């Protein structure tokens, strides 16, 4: 993923009243519980699960009830319970593109503010790789139906 002075990004933060470890676990191992599966998918049918393999280089994908899998990206950094970085391999048409030069990055930091208080800071950067459609993709990801809504659902699931 290319970065530079023209980096186009979405920044979101949410405070959750759970431990740092729980926040990390819900974000990574229980994404199915909070992701908008009906609308935020790339397969033909509503998936039954969102899977993130828990290691650097791991796959991040959706799995349909019939076992069909559609890749979304890769785990770039796996540092529980403090940090997760993902390469998002979806293009401007929300289809998988395996070319790493066209991926964007999702950087999530889980900052412990107490034993049962965690600040989750998410940055989805590199959106300029979408060229002429960069602003369109940014607007979608920056909308209430994008990371804001997803993180609100994450916060509910973490409780």
What are these regions (language model features)?
Residues 1-46:
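Hydrophobic ligand-binding cavity/cleft-lining segments
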Residues 7-15, 59, 70, 83, ...:
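Intrinsic-disorder/low-complexity, polar/charged segments enriched in Ser/Thr/Lys/Arg/Asp/Glu/Gln
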Residues 12-14, 50, 72-77, 103-112:
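Hydrophobic/aromatic beta-strand elements that line small-molecule binding cavities or substrate pockets
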Residues 23-27, 60, 75, 86, ...:
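Hydrophobic pocket/interface hotspot
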Residues 94-145:
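Beta-strand/loop substructures that line and gate deep hydrophobic ligand-binding cavities in soluble
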